[in-house]
């Protein structure tokens, strides 16, 4: 499992993010404080505080580099 910080600060970004990660069979979790939700769940994402960066846990080693490229617009430096 590897983690990166992402920012999802608009409805369009959330929809785009979920559409992109739904193309992968891997599991993804979003971690915000003490809450951990399935990153493929739009309803779950909207239950988080989206005003701050969120930690994305990627449970895949073989697709990691490709996933990072696809999600580059959401990743916080």
Task: Name each region found by the language model.
Residues 1-7:
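Short glycine-/aliphatic-rich beta-strand segments at the starts of folded cytosolic domains
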Residues 4, 18-22, 29, 36, ...:
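N-terminal intrinsically disordered, cationic/polar leader segments
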Residues 11-27, 35-50, 64:
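Amphipathic alpha-helical interaction surfaces in cytosolic regulatory modules
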Residues 49-77:
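C-terminal structural segments of small proteins and small subunits
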């Amino acid at each position: 499992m590897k983690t990166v910080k992402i920012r999802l600060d608009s409805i369009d970004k959330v929809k785009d993010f979920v559409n992109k990660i739904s193309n992968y069979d891997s599991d993804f979790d979003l971690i915000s404080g003490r809450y951990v939700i399935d990153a493929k769940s739009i309803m779950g994402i909207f239950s988080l505080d989206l005003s701050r960066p969120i930690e994305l846990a990627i449970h895949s080693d073989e697709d990691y580099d490709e996933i990072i490229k696809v999600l580059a617009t959401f990743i916080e430096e």
